[in-house]
Regions:
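Loop-centered beta-sheet repeat module
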Residues: 139-206
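N-terminal start-of-chain detector that recognizes signal peptides
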Residues: 15-16, 25-28, 110, 163-165, ...
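Noncatalytic linker/hinge segments flanking ATPase motor cores
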Residues: 82-85, 94-98, 176-182, 285-286, ...
Length: 331
């Protein structure tokens, strides 16, 4: 943020210039929100003709930084900017009573909220033959650890290094389960349904209270992180060279209660011109219209069919971008 002058009795023009810069920044931040997601995972599989078992650990994070800009803050700063009399009066008041006489009249807030979820579980899967149709069923019971952060403060005091302080953090541990089923029809078609986090969980953030400098009213800032079942259905057509996929969420994607929900559909294609090389492209859209639609692309390498390296990137509207990598080894 633009700094307020430490010596309010200095140049009135400088004081008004600082007020203008700060008002301009508040105008720019009004309604702005930034979101980010990240994930990582590790799995060790033990294939078996009767029952396949895999030990898994994965984590994913969801974060959002947003501002709540009070229009009265902007109006107050514009009055300082445009009137020498107002600027001189505010500067004199600050000189006599301290510079907090200025900032106490500014009540815009900034909020950084984040959730980090880690899963530790054992996945078991088995294939059956139902009327000549190969059907695979898998279940993953898992321990789920969640950390939820709610760093909300005056926008003029916001410090991104403080968001993970323990006084803004809530910890929670629970149990959850994933499950899925897939069937192969003929040589080229596979259809399936998967369910993640089949047990709903709610984790409340810390209740952060901020006093309004103008009215004296104490405002409570609290949220709830929602873990909800996510059920997705998909189909794939494949041969030795090409795989085409389509999938869609049958349930909404939840996050913080204060956020809009999303529900995604996507299509993708993979071409394997060489036994050790795969090239991928796809598109994902939010049918709710609350998240950016994105294009994805990637490449996979499998030298000697032992080491598998997958790289991907995505790009979409509203300055949405991302990247990912996966490494696996077969022994």
């Amino acid at each position: 943020m633009a700094p307020l002058p430490t010596n309010p009795l200095g140049s009135i023009n400088q004081f008004q210039g600082a007020a203008k810069d700060l008002a301009d920044e508040l105008d720019y931040l009004k309604g702005k929100t930034a979101r980010a997601t990240a994930g990582a995972g590790l799995a060790v599989s033990i294939p078996n003709d009767v029952l396949s078992v895999a030990f898994m650990a994965k984590g994913y994070a969801h974060g959002r930084v947003s501002s709540s800009i009070d229009q009265q803050d902007i109006d107050y700063l514009r009055r300082i900017q445009r009137s020498n009399v107002v600027a001189a009066g505010v500067a004199l008041d600050a000189a006599l009573n301290g510079t907090d006489q200025i900032t106490k009249n500014l009540n815009s807030t900034a909020s950084g909220r984040a959730a980090i979820v880690s899963d530790y579980g054992v996945a078991v899967a088995r294939q059956f033959d139902l009327g000549g149709v190969p059907v695979s069923v898998g279940v993953t019971p898992k321990l789920q650890k969640t950390w939820v952060y709610n760093y909300t403060t005056s926008i003029y005091d916001y410090d991104s290094n403080k968001w993970n302080d323990s006084r803004y953090r809530t910890d929670d541990t629970g149990f959850n389960v994933d499950a899925g089923i897939a069937a192969d029809f003929g040589e080229h078609w596979t259809v399936g349904v998967s369910g993640q986090n089949l047990m709903s969980r709610d984790i409340d953030t810390k209740d952060i209270r901020i006093r309004n400098g103008r009215t004296g009213e104490v405002v409570s800032y609290k949220d709830t992180y929602q873990i909800r079942p996510l059920v997705t259905a998909g189909a794939a057509w494949h041969n030795d060279l090409v795989t085409l996929t389509a999938d869609g969420d049958l349930t909404e994607t939840k996050g913080f209660k204060s956020e809009d929900t999303s529900q995604y559909v996507g299509v993708g294609a993979e071409v394997t011109p060489l036994s050790w090389l795969a090239v991928r492209a796809g598109y994902r859209a939010d049918v709710k219209g609350n998240d950016s639609n994105v294009f994805t692309g990637g490449v996979g390498f499998a030298p000697f069919s032992t080491v598998h390296v997958d790289l991907m990137g995505l790009y979409g509207e509203d300055e949405t971008w991302g990247a990912g990598a996966q490494l696996s080894m077969t022994f």
